[in-house]
């Protein structure tokens, strides 16, 4: 019986190293698997971080583009509102010219007539309203300025030097500093 017991014990002790070896091998394999898993996790993490950075950069660019478009639209809207009167002002210029022509004609006949005074008051009121909305006549003093004046003809003038404005043929107007229509003038040429 002792022999049997010894044999069994020997048999167990022989098995133990084998199972121990298997356990060690299993642990090594698990260690390798953990290392591989850890490496894969690192790769996945690096890939994720790279993609995150790319997406974040794209987001920042798109956001910046959006802000630029938003600012441009606000500026365009502001400009459109600021110059909204420009078209109607251009349409009114021939009416103003006709009123001015009627006034000049009536003033030549009789400067003190009710018609002349009525036209004069109408012109004054019209110019007040236009000025309130940023529309004003271009001054045509002595100096010719190609930014504001359009020289239609050159005339001899003993009273004016070369290049000076002699006569205003058609009043020019500007809207908030921008020329709507240049003044049509004649300038002196004494050569």
From Swiss-Prot:
Keywords: Chaperone, Cytoplasm, Stress response. Its main location: cytoplasm. The keyword Chaperone applies. The keyword Chaperone applies. It comes from the Bacteria. One of its GO terms (molecular function) is protein homodimerization activity. Residues 1-19, 29-42 have a biased composition (Basic and acidic residues). It is found in: Cytoplasm. GO terms for cellular component: cytosol. Residues 1-42 are annotated as: Disordered. GO terms for biological process: protein folding. InterPro entries: GrpE, GrpE_coiled_coil, GrpE_head. Homodimer. Belongs to the GrpE family. PANTHER family: GRPE PROTEIN, GRPE PROTEIN HOMOLOG, MITOCHONDRIAL. Participates actively in the response to hyperosmotic and heat shock by preventing the aggregation of stress-denatured proteins, in association with DnaK and GrpE. It is the nucleotide exchange factor for DnaK and may function as a thermosensor. Unfolded proteins bind initially to DnaJ; upon interaction with the DnaJ-bound protein, DnaK hydrolyzes its bound ATP, resulting in the formation of a stable complex. GrpE releases ADP from DnaK; ATP binding to DnaK triggers the release of the substrate protein, thus completing the reaction cycle. HAMAP family: GrpE. This is Protein GrpE. It comes from Helicobacter pylori (strain HPAG1). The gene is grpE.
